[in-house]
Regions:
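A short, acidic, amphipathic alpha-helical segment used as a generic capping/interface helix at domain edges
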Residues: 244-260
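Alpha/beta catalytic cores of group-transfer enzymes, especially the acyltransferase/condensing modules
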Residues: 10-12, 39-41, 100-244
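NAD(P)-dependent dehydrogenase/reductase Rossmann-like domain
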Residues: 207, 212, 246, 258, ...
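FabD-like malonyl-/acyl-CoA
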Residues: 1-139, 263-291
Length: 294
C-alpha cells in the first residue's frame, strides 16, 4: 500500500542527532558537510555535541531537524511508495523536499532564513505557548480573543495550543483553568504561529519569492488550509501564511487519511504518532527517526 509521509517540526530535536547516520552513510556525511558550507557555521558540531539548551534554540533547531529529516527520507525513499506528504510546521519544508518542490540547498537556505527571522521575533517580542487539554475550541477561541492571544496548533479535538505574549498567555491560562481546562506550558522560546511572528513572515516572503521551485510529485496537505495542494503558487502561499497562522494538524490528518491509512513519520524523534492516533486510531503509523529504524 502507498504511504502518507509526514515530517515532524520544531521540538523533535535531540542531542547527538545524526551522528550515527554521519558515521554510517556517505549520503549523510556529504549532506551534513554541505550544510556546514551553506549555513556558514558548523551545524554538525551543534547537532552532534551541543547541550539541549543550545540545540533547542530556534536558529539551530530548525536547520538541524530539516537536515536530519531529509537524510532519513533519502535513505528510505526507494523502499516505500508515497501517495501524499505533510509536515508539522517546520516539517512542511522537509515534506516539500521529499516532494521535489526544491532541492536540498534551496530548502536549507529558506529554512535558515525562517529560523533566523523567527529567532529575531523571539528576542523582539517575547512570548510563550501552552497546550490546552479537554476544552472545546470555541471556548478556547473566546478566551484567546478576550486577552489578545491566538490559537496556534489544532493538534486534535482534545489538544489545542495557544500562543501569544507572556502576559496574554498567563491571563488565558488562568481563565482556562477556572473553567476546568488542563493547561500545560510548552518548552519553547517564542510565540510561534501567532501575530508576534509577523516580522518573520515578511522575511520569508522575500526568499520564497526569489527562489526556484519545481512541480510536486504528490499532493502536499498544507498546515495553513489542510487541503491537498499541487500548484506551485498555492504551496508558496501556504508556506508564507503558516508562520503566523494556526497549524491545522487535525484537519490535515483527516485529509490525508482519505488517501491512505498507512503513515510514515520521519524526523529526529517520535512525536506525531501519538497525536495522530488521537485523531484516528485506525491509522497505521511507522516511525523512522534514527539508524535503528532503517
Amino acid at each position: 500500500m502507498k504511504n502518507c509521509f509526514i515530517f515532524s517540526g520544531q521540538g523533535s530535536h535531540r542531542p547527538g542527532m545524526s551522528l550515527n547516520l554521519y558515521n554510517t552513510f556517505q549520503i549523510a556525511k556529504d549532506r551534513i558537510e554541505l550544510s556546514n558550507k551553506i549555513l556558514g557555521y558548523d551545524i554538525s558540531e551543534i547537532m552532534f555535541s551541543a547541550e539541549e539548551n543550545v540545540l533547542r534554540q530556534t536558529q539551530y533547531a530548525q536547520p538541524a531537524i530539516f537536515i536530519h529529516s531529509t537524510i532519513l527520507f533519502d535513505l528510505i525513499k526507494d523502499q516505500k511508495e508515497c501517495v501524499a506528504v505533510a509536515g508539522h510546521s517546520l516539517g512542511e519544508f522537509s515534506a516539500l523536499y521529499a516532494n521535489n518542490f526544491f532541492d536540498f540547498e534551496t530548502g536549507l537556505k529558506i529554512v535558515d532564513v525562517r529560523a533566523r527571522a523567527m529567532h529575531e521575533c523571539e528576542l523582539n517580542y517575547p512570548g510563550k505557548m501552552s497546550a490546552v487539554i479537554g476544552t472545546s475550541i470555541d471556548k478556547i477561541q473566546s478566551i484567546c480573543d478576550s486577552v489578545d492571544c491566538q490559537i496556534a496548533n489544532i493538534n486534535s479535538d482534545s489538544q489545542i495550543v495557544i500562543s501569544g505574549s507572556e502576559e496574554s498567555i498567563d491571563l488565558a491560562s488562568k481563565s482556562l483553568k477556572n473553567i476546568g481546562s488542563k493547561v500545560i506550558p510548552l518548552s519553547v522560546s517564542g510565540a510561534f504561529h501567532a501575530k508576534l511572528m509577523s516580522d518573520a513572515k515578511n522575511k520569508l516572503i522575500d526568499i520564497i519569492n526569489t527562489s526556484r521551485f519545481n512541480e510536486v510529485c504528490y499532493p502536499i496537505v498544507s498546515n495553513f488550509n489542510a487541503k491537498p495542494n499541487i500548484s506551485i503558487e498555492s504551496i508558496k502561499d501556504a508556506l508564507i501564511e503558516q508562520i503566523d497562522n494556526p497549524v491545522q494538524w487535525s484537519k490535515s490528518i483527516k485529509s490525508l487519511s482519505k488517501l491512505s491509512s498507512e503513515f510514515l513519520e520521519i524526523g529526529p524523534k517520535k512525536v506525531l504518532s501519538n497525536i495522530i492516533k488521537k485523531i484516528d486510531d485506525s491509522l497505521t503509523i511507522t516511525t523512522y527517526n534514527s539508524i535503528e529504524n532503517l
